[in-house]
Curated annotation (Swiss-Prot):
The lineage of its organism: Eukaryota, Viridiplantae, Streptophyta, Embryophyta, Tracheophyta. This is Quinone-oxidoreductase QR1, chloroplastic. It comes from Triphysaria versicolor. PANTHER family: ZINC-TYPE ALCOHOL DEHYDROGENASE-LIKE PROTEIN C16A3.02C (PTHR44013:SF1). Gene3D superfamilies: Medium-chain alcohol dehydrogenases, catalytic domain, NAD(P)-binding Rossmann-like Domain. NADPH-dependent single-electron reducing quinone reductase. Involved in haustorium initiation in parasitic plants through redox cycling of exogenous haustorium-inducing factors. Can use 9,10-phenanthrenequinone (PAQ), 1,2-naphthoquinone, 5-hydroxy-1,4-naphthoquinone (juglone) and 2,6-dimethoxy-p-benzoquinone (DMBQ) as substrates, but has no activity with menadione, diamide, 2,3-dimethoxy-5-methyl-1,4-benzoquinone or 1,4-naphthoquinone. Pfam families: ADH_N, ADH_zinc_N_2. One of its GO terms (molecular function) is NADPH:quinone reductase activity.
Length: 329
């Protein structure tokens, strides 16, 4: 495909929001050693995508401009690089592109073989594209930070999941209920039925005084909180935690990181932990298998064509999507 062009969406610098996106034609990338070229069928947006555009980790990411954003994709392998052993052209796959290096809002993308997994015919491209960052963030929070076994074994845990109708929250509720848990979830009242259908035992409206205070309707103290919403002060979490309760914050800012450090330095029994997701192919493959078995699903808020990527971007920035926002080339 050398010399051939593809449609893509990129931005030329920090800031600008949806208006900063540009539709371009660029050369189709070539897979390097240990990489696969994927014809993209679905791209799932994450908050991280537009936060990078806003300069959240400048000057480290994006590494250079112009930059094609988005990393979580599903599609079909069309070409393999040197030393690729597990994939061949025609394979349907789910992948994370470029380890936060972007490239997703396009017709084709290159992924490392290590961050690519096979997608069975029972699992759609749109549904599986939500898994790499959002699904694995939920999985990592539950299994590594909380120590939950996803097979109903182990000690019972009371878990709170905030923003449970969002991209990460929806997966966290479903995965948590595979373990020995009682799950309390927060969301807006319009999403109560949805979140209950995902398995939540209790649902509270974050707009009510009780919801804002994270109070469990049954009066339970939380052994763990997976916080997927906007930052809250430690004083809101602390009284709701059990003796050794833990808060896992998936979108930590400077203040959250400071609080996390303080709870560690003071040897507090109640802890605030920040989570930076690590993408591993074996964990992604596990989530895809759960989907195939019908134990995990993706709630899709909306789908947009690549030509309307700005609308998808704006909706993601708005922050009120129910589930995942998907772009289809």
């Amino acid at each position: 495909m050398a010399g051939k062009l593809m449609r893509a969406v990129q931005y030329d610098g920090y800031g600008g929001g949806a208006a900063g996106l540009k539709h371009v034609e660029v050369p189709i990338p070539s897979p390097g050693k240990g990489e696969v070229l994927i014809k993209l069928e679905a791209i799932s947006l994450n908050q991280l995508d537009w936060k990078l555009q806003n300069g959240m980790v400048r000057p480290f990411l994006p590494r250079k401009f112009p930059f094609i954003p988005a990393t979580d994709v599903a599609g079909e392998v069309v070409r393999i690089g040197q030393d690729v052993k597990n994939f061949k052209p025609g394979d349907k796959v789910v992948a994370m592109l470029g380890s936060f290096g972007g490239g997703g809002l396009a017709e084709y993308g290159v992924a490392s073989e290590k961050l690519t997994v096979h997608r069975p015919p029972e699992v759609s491209a749109a549904e599986s594209s939500g898994l790499p960052i959002a699904g694995l963030t939920a999985h990592m929070a539950l299994t590594q930070h909380i120590g939950l076994n996803l097979d109903k074994s182990g000690p019972h845990k009371n878990i709170l999941i905030t923003a449970a109708s969002g991209g990460v929250g929806q997966y966290a509720v479903q995965l948590a209920k595979l373990g020995n848990t009682h799950v309390t979830a927060t969301c807006g009242s319009r999403n109560f039925d949805l979140v209950k259908s995902l398995g939540a035992d209790e649902v509270i409206d974050y707009k009510t005084p009780e919801g804002a205070a994270l109070k469990s309707p049954s009066g339970k103290k939380y052994d763990a909180v997976i916080h997927c919403a906007s930052p809250l002060p430690w004083s809101v979490f602390k009284p709701n935690l059990s003796k050794h309760g833990k808060v896992i914050d998936i979108t930590p800012g400077p203040r959250v990181m400071l609080t996390s450090a303080m709870t560690k330095l003071t040897c507090s029994k109640k802890r605030l932990v920040t989570l930076l997701v690590v993408i591993k192919g074996e964990h992604l493959s596990y989530l895809v298998e759960l989907m195939r078995e019908g134990k995990l699903k993706t709630v899709i808020d909306s789908k947009f064509s690549l030509s309307k990527a700005e609308e998808a971007w704006a909706k993601s920035i708005d922050g009120h999507a129910t589930g995942k926002i998907v772009v289809e080339p």
